[in-house]
């Protein structure tokens, strides 16, 4: 099926048996995460990487100026007070992301061989997809992000959402999406949504959230996070 989201694609070097779809953050594009995808590509010879580009829309946080964004953001200091979230924009983006997933399914890749992930705003969309989708994905990657629509998300959850494995990474010096929002989000998933938090040192479990903190890391990624993500992906796509 055709997809409405423009995207970059890195084809696997061997037979295609799995797909990773990764959503960038506010103001970025798929090109921003291309170096990371290329870094991981050689370790996953059967994986296709898809890096979508967000549409350009007016963003309240940017004084109404248009920029690449998955949904409108009004503030960054109240991310866990979700009643002002752009629910309509989020749900529209979910449909577009699901088109990408469906295209992979139509090409012969099972849902349980597809990982969806994202950074910051893209991570929030990935988490929202995980909680509401009827698809049983191989896993979800949430980097430097938060749980959106937390005032109503429990009522929106699919019955198998908590069975999807999660890798969650966040830097302790994040000046954009404060580290405490990441901590609170993981606590929310455990306490309100029934997720299982993995013990420190556990690489992967199905189901389970692997939560990794990176001391001193700002709103970005780091080599250790990429290594941790690689070890998690190895298990998720085994």
Swiss-Prot record:
Compartments where found: Cytoplasm; Nucleus
Catalytic activity: S-hexadecanoyl-L-cysteinyl-[protein] + H2O = L-cysteinyl-[protein] + hexadecanoate + H(+)
Active-site residues per Swiss-Prot or TrEMBL entry: 120, 174, 219
EC number: 3.1.2.-, 3.1.2.22
GO molecular function: carboxylic ester hydrolase activity; palmitoyl-(protein) hydrolase activity
Superkingdom per UniProt: Eukaryota
Keywords per UniProt: Cytoplasm, Fatty acid metabolism, Hydrolase, Lipid metabolism, Nucleus, Serine esterase
Record bears the keyword Membrane: no
InterPro entries reported in the protein's UniProt record: AB_hydrolase_fold, LYPA1-2/EST-like, PLipase/COase/thioEstase
Entry GO CC: cytoplasm; nucleus
Main subcellular localisation: cytoplasm
Function: Hydrolyzes fatty acids from S-acylated cysteine residues in proteins with a strong preference for palmitoylated G-alpha proteins over other acyl substrates. Mediates the deacylation of G-alpha proteins such as GPA1 in vivo, but has weak or no activity toward palmitoylated Ras proteins. Has weak lysophospholipase activity in vitro; however such activity may not exist in vivo.
Protein family according to the UniProt entry: Belongs to the AB hydrolase superfamily. AB hydrolase 2 family.
Protein's name in the database: Acyl-protein thioesterase 1
Organism for this UniProt entry: Cryptococcus neoformans var. neoformans serotype D (strain JEC21 / ATCC MYA-565) (Filobasidiella neoformans)
């Amino acid at each position: 099926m055709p997809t409405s989201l423009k995207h970059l694609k890195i084809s696997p070097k061997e037979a295609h048996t799995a797909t990773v779809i990764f959503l960038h953050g506010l103001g970025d594009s798929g090109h921003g995460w291309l170096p990371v995808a290329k870094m991981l590509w050689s370790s996953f010879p059967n994986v296709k990487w898809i890096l979508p580009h967000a549409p350009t829309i007016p963003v309240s946080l940017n004084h109404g100026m248009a920029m690449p964004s998955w949904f409108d953001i009004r503030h960054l200091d109240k991310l866990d007070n979700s009643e002002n979230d752009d629910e309509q924009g989020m749900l529209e983006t979910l449909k577009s992301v699901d088109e990408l997933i469906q295209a992979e399914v139509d090409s012969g890749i099972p849902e349980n061989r597809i990982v969806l992930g994202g950074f910051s705003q893209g991570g929030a969309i990935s988490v929202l997809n995980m909680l509401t989708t009827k698809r049983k994905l191989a896993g979800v990657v949430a980097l430097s992000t938060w749980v959106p629509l937390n005032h109503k998300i429990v009522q929106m959850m699919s019955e198998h959402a908590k069975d999807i494995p999660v890798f969650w990474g966040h830097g302790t010096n994040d000046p954009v999406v404060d580290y405490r929002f990441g901590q609170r989000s993981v606590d929310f998933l455990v306490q309100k949504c029934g997720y299982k938090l993995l013990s420190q040192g556990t690489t992967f479990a199905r189901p389970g959230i692997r939560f990794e903190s990176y001391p001193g890391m700002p709103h970005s990624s780091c080599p250790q996070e990429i290594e941790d993500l690689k070890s998690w992906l190895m298990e998720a796509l085994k």
